[in-house]
């Protein structure tokens, strides 16, 4: 298969123009089809990397260490003016259906069924929106019904793997489960758009009896409870196990590696946190940097797996974030509010450029 055509197909699903690409894809031969890894980072700003996406390195580019992002960039394309929606659910619903968010109308965070997450206003009457997310089947109110490009991949012979954050549909709706969208394997994906904690010492948000103490508790990682393994690393290990199994199926794979990092809470990844303190970052900023480098290590581990298994030359890797970087949470970031994506204004949740500009790259 033409790899440039397929990467266009996957990228087009973000913009809602995937129909023609789907038709071309279905007409291709089934021999030597490339694997696909879509590596999604949560809340990663355009400067949250040592790789500059501007004409010069910024202060944040100098502060962070992301050698595997640099490694990926050497092998592929960089998109220096990449944009997403300003919040995760809108971007992710567009991704899975190929529909622009102005059409699917998932315009705020989704979580609980039939409950809006809009702030109440005494002066503005807010319009109705699809707060139950998206689905492939009719029957749920305030839901956009669309076709999953993952299901199309599965139907054409791909082994499909979801690992990490989903955030496609509200709790107790069909769309909350990645299996509904054509993923044959679901690792830790559910309705929530965040996480309770990255820490295995807190069982990723579960009590000792196994019950979640938060709607944001990460499911499916029970084998790592109490082991000291950070959530980012646990997800990476499970993804690699799934790839090891996929090798035996004699079919191409699609891995959606959808990290919860670098979403709040900004827990310290102790594999990297001390290094950033020594570099002079504050405790909050060092913790933030540790999440970034932990995610970068995950990217490197997956690339190493491809090299080890002779799949690197037959795998498309697409790297992106779901919205702009965090810039309005003084509990988690130091510095003046709305400046963490400077010279762009504001960040996640805002319609200023800091809220919608993200990092994009692809290895074809």
Give the residues covered by each predicted segment.
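Substrate-binding rim/cap in mid-to-C-terminal beta-strand-loop elements of soluble/periplasmic
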Residues: 75, 96, 194-198, 300-308, ...
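Metal-dependent active-site segment of extracytoplasmic phospho-/sulfohydrolases and closely related
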Residues: 251-253, 258-259, 294-332
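Active-site segment of extracytoplasmic enzymes that catalyze sulfate/phosphate-ester chemistry
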Residues: 21, 38-39, 46-147, 152, ...
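Formylglycine-dependent
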Residues: 111-159, 166-253, 259-268, 282-283, ...
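Short, solvent-exposed turn/loop segments enriched in Gly/Ser/Thr/Pro and often Arg
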Residues: 53, 76-99, 107-114, 162-174, ...
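Bacterial N-terminal signal peptides
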Residues: 8-16
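Bacterial N-terminal signal peptides that target proteins for export
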Residues: 1-7
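Loop/turn elements at helix/coil->beta-strand transitions in domains of secreted/extracellular proteins
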Residues: 32-37, 75-80, 155-161, 181-184, ...
């Amino acid at each position: 298969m033409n790899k440039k055509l397929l990467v266009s197909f996957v990228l087009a699903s973000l913009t809602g123009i995937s129909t023609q690409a789907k038709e071309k894809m279905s007409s291709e031969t089934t021999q030597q089809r490339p694997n696909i890894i879509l590596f999604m980072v949560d809340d990663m700003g355009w400067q949250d990397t040592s790789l500059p996406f501007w004409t010069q390195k910024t202060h944040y580019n100098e502060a962070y260490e992301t050698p595997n992002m640099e490694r990926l960039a050497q092998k592929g394309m960089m998109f220096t003016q990449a944009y997403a929606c300003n919040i995760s659910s809108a971007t992710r619903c567009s991704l899975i259906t190929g529909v622009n968010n102005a059409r699917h109308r998932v315009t705020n965070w989704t979580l609980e069924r039939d409950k809006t997450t809009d702030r109440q206003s005494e002066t503005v009457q807010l319009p109705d929106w699809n707060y139950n997310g998206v689905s492939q089947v009719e029957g749920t109110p305030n839901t956009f019904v669309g076709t999953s490009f993952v299901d199309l991949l599965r139907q054409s012979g791909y082994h499909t793997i979801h690992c990490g954050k989903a955030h496609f549909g509200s709790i107790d709706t069909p769309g909350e489960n990645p299996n509904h969208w054509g993923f044959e394997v679901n690792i830790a994906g559910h309705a929530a758009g965040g996480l309770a904690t990255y820490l295995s010492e807190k069982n990723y948000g579960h009590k000792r009896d196994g019950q979640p103490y938060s709607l944001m508790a990460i499911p499916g990682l029970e084998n790592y409870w109490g082991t000291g393994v950070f959530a980012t690393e646990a997800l990476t290990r499970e993804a690699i196990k799934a790839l090891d199994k996929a090798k035996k199926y004699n079919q191409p794979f699609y891995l959606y590696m959808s990290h919860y990092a670098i979403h709040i809470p900004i827990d310290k990844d102790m594999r990297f946190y001390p290094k950033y303190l020594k570099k002079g970052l504050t405790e909050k900023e060092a913790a933030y940097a540790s999440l970034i480098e932990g995610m970068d290590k995950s990217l490197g581990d997956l690339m190493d797996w491809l090299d080890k298994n002779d799949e690197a030359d037959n795998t498309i890797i697409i790297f992106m974030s779901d919205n702009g970087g965090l810039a309005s949470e003084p509990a988690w970031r130091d510095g003046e509010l709305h400046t963490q994506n400077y010279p762009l204004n504001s960040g996640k949740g805002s319609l200023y450029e800091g809220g919608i500009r993200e990092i994009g790259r692809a290895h074809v």
